[in-house]
């Protein structure tokens, strides 16, 4: 839950309650990330994890970006806004890996890609388990090949970004969580952590029956008092409505609350 909702207070509260609290490294500098890890460690002796964005290997297609900008132009003009220039960065990838190895949280999970085997080896040397977010069998195979300790199986029900990195023909809508778990349970021997639409005990029981070793909760915790969720987002989440998949803001598919056409 990068971008605000993830806080050290939320990670502490989850771990103290018996879960495995996570800190999101996305959209913040390496120094701020390190400070949050230290704040969690100072407040609890329970295990916790961190999540990192894996930078894209392939450059964005200029033609596709140009078409996207052209489609946005009328709305930008209507709102009196200027379209910015595309920016490409790696979210302080190398520096954040250094932080993880130095601070050694229990788990480092990865989204938008699969770290190299050399990175996984480095994490293991620092006594950090490596989890990789996947949305299909091909991605799970990639995670297994680099030595990942567990697979985070993200179903289409998940809010926020799609964590996939290998196209499998299922489109942006993706595969439902229970179906994905059954597929991966048969295809891959690694432990499965289920995520996507888990908001209560019944949903958690369902994913455990489908082959998961654990369940991961995201959106449901955005209303927790410890979360850094802005008031406008809290109000929107408190009134359930339709969602849609969009590439707005980051160009990566993400599911969010629909605010109009």
Where are these regions (language model features)?
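Conserved active-site-proximal phosphate/metal-binding subdomains
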Residues: 161-193, 198-261
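Active-site entrance/lid segments in N-terminal catalytic domains of soluble metabolic enzymes
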Residues: 1-187
